[in-house]
Amino acid sequence: MTTISSFPSIFVPLVGLVFPAIAMASLSLYVQKTKIF
């Protein structure tokens, strides 16, 4: 049960850092592809 209790401490920063990075990258690629700006 130690790994389950320590899982959120690793999972939360991972989601908090990786998900915005993927969102920013996909957004920048979408803007470059569509050439809106």
UniProtKB/Swiss-Prot annotation:
One of its GO terms (cellular component) is chloroplast thylakoid membrane. It is a single-pass membrane protein. It is found in: Plastid, Chloroplast thylakoid membrane. GO terms for biological process: photosynthesis. InterPro entries: PSI_PsaI, PSI_PsaI_sf. The chain crosses the membrane at residues 10-30. SUPFAM superfamilies: Subunit VIII of photosystem I reaction centre, PsaI (SSF81540). It comes from the Eukaryota. It holds the Pfam family PSI_8. Keywords: Chloroplast, Membrane, Photosynthesis, Photosystem I, Plastid, Thylakoid, Transmembrane, Transmembrane helix. HAMAP family: PSI_PsaI (MF_00431). May help in the organization of the PsaL subunit. Belongs to the PsaI family. This is Photosystem I reaction center subunit VIII. It comes from Gossypium barbadense.
